[in-house]
């Protein structure tokens, strides 16, 4: 039965969250497979979790033996008996985790994905496909989630199967978050300030936005050239995104005002705001430098005072040793005189 627009929108609006354990398992599966092969081939596995119709939680996964022909995409092999036996064993361990879909290492959709997806419909009505980019070239979420739907064409021809993209996030459970925080606590660089962290995050966000805009531009260009059919659902979503953009044009000051004069107020306001932000950054840097100089001077003064105290103690010790030596020298002649007197008296006693 062809999927209606409402059903397609319900699939697109589903919240898909992937646990970090799944990403670790997929990467480990890929590395173990590539170690025994000369060519890099994609790997396929099964996703386990919960799907309540609105939220999809992918919490676990397991690998599946899979082979395909590089020259003919329609020739592939997936051991469904292995899938059934592993699924039964996972049910005994955790009955809450059910088979909700499958994954492969992509990094893009393949021609045989629709046929593989039909195979997984034996186990779940609407399987979820998650493509995990095991070798990402850009920063961002390394997962892409898809649901298969029947696309209704405008010319009245027969429907065709296609995948619709749904947003996905990486979300860890509380125990996983505690473990990650414990590991990162020892390797986190405390010297990195909050400002640099914010700037790095904003730069990564802008890079991801630029990548998405390039994808949108390439898609619209292909639709314009006739390489792809017109999809009203995608165009409607793009129009909603464009409608959210702020109106940066200012009203004209008079009937004879030109566009340049009309936008001068906006440019002036943006310049003032930018200058204020740069002034705040400059003042904060200046205050931080002055504080560092103050701490340096305080450390110098403390080191000098401590050095003077050590020198004074050292001089006192040397003076004390000199006095003791002088006292010993003064006492030794008196003792010698006493001994000589005793020797003089001793012969007299003998004579008596």
Curated annotation (Swiss-Prot):
InterPro entries: EIF3F/CSN6-like_C, JAMM/MPN+_dom, MPN, MPN_RPN7_8
Secreted is among the record's keywords: no
Ranges where the MPN domain occurs: 16-152
Chain spans, region Disordered: 303-352
GO molecular function, one term: metallopeptidase activity
Role: Acts as a regulatory subunit of the 26S proteasome which is involved in the ATP-dependent degradation of ubiquitinated proteins.
Family that this chain belongs to: Belongs to the peptidase M67A family.
Annotated protein name in UniProt: 26S proteasome regulatory subunit rpn-8
């Amino acid at each position: 039965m062809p999927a209606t627009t409402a059903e397609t929108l319900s699939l697109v609006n589903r919240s898909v969250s992937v646990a970090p354990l799944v990403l670790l398992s997929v990467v480990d599966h890929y590395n173990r497979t590539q170690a025994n092969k000369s060519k890099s081939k994609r790997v396929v596995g099964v996703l386990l979790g919960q799907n309540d119709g609105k939220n999809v939680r992918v919490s676990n996964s397991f690998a599946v033996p899979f082979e395909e022909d590089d020259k003919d995409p329609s020739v592939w092999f997936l051991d469904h008996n292995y899938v059934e036996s592993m699924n039964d064993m996972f049910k005994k361990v955790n009955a809450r985790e059910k088979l909700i879909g499958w994954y492969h290492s992509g990094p893009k959709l393949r021609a045989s994905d629709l046929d593989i997806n039909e195979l997984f419909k034996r186990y779940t009505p609407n399987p979820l496909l998650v493509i995990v980019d095991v070798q990402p070239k850009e920063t961002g979420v390394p997962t892409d989630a898809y649901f298969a739907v029947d696309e209704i064409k405008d010319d009245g021809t027969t429907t065709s199967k296609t995948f619709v993209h749904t947003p996905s996030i990486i979300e860890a459970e509380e125990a996983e978050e505690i473990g990650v925080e414990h590991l990162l606590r020892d390797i986190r660089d405390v010297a990195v300030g909050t400002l640099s962290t914010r700037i790095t995050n904003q730069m990564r966000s802008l890079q991801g936005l630029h990548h998405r805009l390039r994808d949108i531009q390439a898609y619209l260009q292909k639709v314009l050239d006739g390489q792809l059919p017109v999809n009203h659902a995608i165009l409607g979503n793009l129009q909603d995104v464009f409608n959210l953009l702020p109106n940066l044009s200012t009203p004209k000051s008079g009937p004879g005002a030109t566009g340049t004069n009309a936008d001068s107020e906006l440019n002036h306001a943006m310049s003032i705001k930018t200058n204020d932000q740069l002034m705040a950054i400059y003042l904060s840097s200046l205050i931080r430098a002055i504080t560092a100089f103050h701490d340096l001077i305080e450390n110098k003064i403390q080191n000098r005072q401590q050095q003077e105290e050590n020198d004074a103690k050292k001089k006192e010790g040397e003076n004390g040793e000199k006095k003791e030596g002088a006292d010993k020298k003064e006492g030794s002649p008196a003792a010698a005189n006493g001994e000589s007197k005793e020797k003089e008296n001793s012969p007299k006693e003998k004579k008596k």
